[in-house]
């Protein structure tokens, strides 16, 4: 068998165990089974692809499809490859704000809010992301696959880049206007559970890669240095949808089984759980959205007794903000309006999205939950969900 035939056979086998099948099955089963199947499917593909590519992440020119549409600790190497893309005007990023505990003054403002499709829009085709800064019109950004936009796409803290994992479990990074698109190959990464999370320097992301499937399942969580593709393992972590605090010192994630939320340091050590959440408590959490700059507060989706845990897919809905040290629910000055989503900014303020009639409103709160200001959200964005907020 010649080399070309071998590569074709391996590619065909990998297609048969594509993570697309995992996604469909995971969405029809319990969260725990979904996580197990996610790992199993990705690992099987890695074993077959490994014969041709090895275990190193490789950044190579992307040749498996169109680039994103522009807008008019042991380590291994995941080498990035630039993807040619059409030059287009770029949006302007504001300077990164200093990290604060949340004692914001009256001059605090809402930064750039980034939007993507809601879960009801799942599909195979590409979809545009958008940004909105109060006082300006919404800006159309790059397009990414719909499933990735819903399940794992995440905007960097500086608002300059987007990271996502595609249907083949490859990590992608591109500027928000679609330029400088890169695909990281060689290892498959988890697209559904341990989804990408940016480091506060906007130069690294944490991912979970599948190392092998035989004789037993082996996965590892680590950090990818995007400039070089270097992958460094950070700990034996098990959970979903991680968040990284703006001060760089805290990782937070649901454990995906008992309803607990775990916090560790940036190296995956010194683990603790949010009190009175999960296990035998009457509240649980399987979905988190945002972590305060120092890791002391977290915006999440609380579930009550007997409430279904949902599936493995990411949910960005928020109905509470908790103190991670006490488990106490923070009182938010929202005027009786329903909380839909919430994101912390690097200065410690909180951007809360609330529903008001036929449109939504963005409310800026200080670190104690007191209202600073609010602004109506454009009606064109009502059917979108917020993916993040950058200063």
Predicted regions located by residue number:
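Blade-level signature of beta-propeller repeat domains, shared across WD40, Kelch, NHL, RCC1
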Residues: 356-391
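N-terminal export/targeting signals for secretion/compartment entry
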Residues: 1-82
